């Protein structure tokens, strides 16, 4: 599937949901006494979606990959702070909610890894490298594939 805007990306949407849920957690009165933990986890959670967006907008596959790895690192940082939080004396009553957030973070991380793996194995260099010639060649290749698919369907109907 082709995405034109980062807001359409399922992984970006999940990363936004992760950040919103982290902010909902950190607005609890229990977090007031852990201000530095709160600030750090909020920054880390926001960084995930922001790096996905920045990488998507960069225009080259290599830059996208770089930012996906940064986003994945921020996802790990978020999860690490969640692990710390569930062990802090004033936050143990939030363990179930924190556990759900850790699962969400792991899901986002898996999506980022899968996307990065798919980009590593592609010959596509990114929008920045598209020329009129490369666009025309790409269009011709797609049309050829569609034509061959139609021929195959016709052959199958005759059989």
Regions of interest found by a model, annotated:
Residues 1-159:
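Amphipathic alpha-helical assembly/interaction segments
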């Amino acid at each position: 599937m082709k995405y034109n805007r980062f807001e359409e990306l399922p992984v970006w949407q999940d990363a936004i949901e992760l950040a919103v849920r982290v902010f909902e957690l950190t607005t609890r009165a229990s977090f007031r006494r852990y201000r530095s933990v709160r600030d750090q986890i909020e920054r880390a959670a926001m960084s995930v979606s922001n790096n996905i967006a920045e990488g998507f907008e960069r225009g080259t596959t290599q830059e996208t990959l770089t930012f996906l790895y940064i986003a994945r690192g921020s996802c790990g940082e978020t999860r690490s702070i969640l692990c710390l939080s569930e062990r802090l004396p004033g936050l143990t009553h939030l363990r179930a909610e924190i556990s759900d957030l850790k699962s969400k973070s792991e899901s986002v991380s898996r999506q980022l890894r899968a996307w990065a793996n798919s980009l590593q194995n592609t010959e596509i260099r990114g929008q920045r490298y598209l020329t009129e010639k490369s666009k025309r060649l790409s269009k011709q290749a797609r049309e050829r594939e569609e034509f061959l698919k139609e021929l195959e369907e016709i052959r199958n109907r005759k059989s």
